Amino acid sequence: MTRRLFTSESVTEGHPDKIADQISDAVLDAILAQDPQARVACETAVTTGLVLVIGEITTSCYVDIPKVVRETIREIGYTRAKYGFDGDTCAVITSIDEQSPDIALGVNRALEAKTGEMTDDEIEAIGAGDQGMMFGYATNETPELMPMPISLAHRLARRLAEVRKSRLLPYLRPDGKTQVTVEYDGDKPVRVDTIVVSTQHHPDVSQEEIRKDIIEHVVKPVIPEHLLDENTRYFVNPTGRFVIGGPQGDAGLTGRKIIVDTYGGMARHGGGAFSGKDPTKVDRSAAYAARYVAKNIVAAGIADKIEIQLAYAIGVAKPVSIMVDTFGTGKIADEKIVELIKKHFDLRPAGIIRMLDLRRPIYKQTAAYGHFGRTDIDLPWERIDKAEILRMEAGL
């Protein structure tokens, strides 16, 4: 079999782009908690001493956005000005409009309902909030049915935050990045080739101490021992110093970590970000649905790995296309898989919202460490409750 290397990265909750994602989703959750029917498209920018929250929000409730912003920043760990950012003293500017009535026209009553193909009751009168294509992916190379490189990179990033917040490594600060290179023998992951960890730190700690502690307290508890060998390479803060970080080191924007949020580059991406968007936005809800479909198909044993593309037109409820690719691992024909998908999954926006119960404040917890393959939180699109019926109908 051919040997190949594949690399994926993750970032911690203190990374500037992830601060922005978490603020956008914290605002979304605060609104959905009071008004499940709200329309939210919330974008955030963070830089030294400043948070800017912009977007289109249509809701019947009131949310104190600056308060939500400050609470989120404090939870992440930016609580002192010497960290380069402080949730209590940073400026918060908001500029919020209502959703465009032209967009609302297409979303409120889907085109099929207007043309009489279906009743409002059947589709709950929600068309797609935008055109676009979304991808879902699953593979049986890990128990959570995710690609191993992104799965391990997320675990390292989450562990970095754990040892910082528990003060096991009290000199760590919130910003950080991880990267994992996995060696494959054909399609099977066999070892970890390279690990990169960059973490913000107190100025008075030595590079040698950081390297020793990160390998001992972050890498070893997280990466399975059988994947590491004497040839595995470790790069810990390879520039030698990472004191200035967070929004002081780099500006951050919502939606700038879409590959970290999904499959680490192993699958294709339609380009739409998730955070700050209510579930009528198919960028988010249809990507979740595509993952749900893909995971259930792999869990059913119909394929070892699968990529699914869904595509939508604004104001139209039914997907304009559904594509599957099993990379030669399918036990039945791809066309038959598409038939099963159409039969067992309602992929109209209203159907997705109902199927996955998406009008709830569940989004902030997804805004760091990945939206898929999460084993630390219960997400509806990660359930495999349709695997058995799919297996039976596939004749396996």
Swiss-Prot record:
GO terms for molecular function: ATP binding; magnesium ion binding; methionine adenosyltransferase activity. It holds the Pfam family S-AdoMet_synt_M. Its EC number is 2.5.1.6. Keywords: ATP-binding, Cytoplasm, Magnesium, Metal-binding, Nucleotide-binding, One-carbon metabolism, Potassium, Transferase. ATP binds at H15, D175, G176, K177, R241, F242, D250, R256, K257, A273, K277. Its cofactor is Mg(2+); K(+). Pathway: Amino-acid biosynthesis; S-adenosyl-L-methionine biosynthesis; S-adenosyl-L-methionine from L-methionine: step 1/1. L-methionine binds at E56, Q99, D250, K281. It is an enzyme of class 2 (transferase). The lineage of its organism: Bacteria, Bacillati, Bacillota, Clostridia, Thermoanaerobacterales. It is found in: Cytoplasm. Homotetramer; dimer of dimers. SUPFAM superfamilies: S-adenosylmethionine synthetase. Belongs to the AdoMet synthase family. GO terms for cellular component: cytoplasm. This is S-adenosylmethionine synthase. Mg(2+) binds at D17. CDD domains: S-AdoMet_synt. It catalyses: L-methionine + ATP + H2O = S-adenosyl-L-methionine + phosphate + diphosphate. NCBIfam families: metK. It comes from the Bacteria. GO terms for biological process: one-carbon metabolic process; S-adenosylmethionine biosynthetic process. Catalyzes the formation of S-adenosylmethionine (AdoMet) from methionine and ATP. The overall synthetic reaction is composed of two sequential steps, AdoMet formation and the subsequent tripolyphosphate hydrolysis which occurs prior to release of AdoMet from the enzyme. K(+) binds at E43. Its main location: cytoplasm.
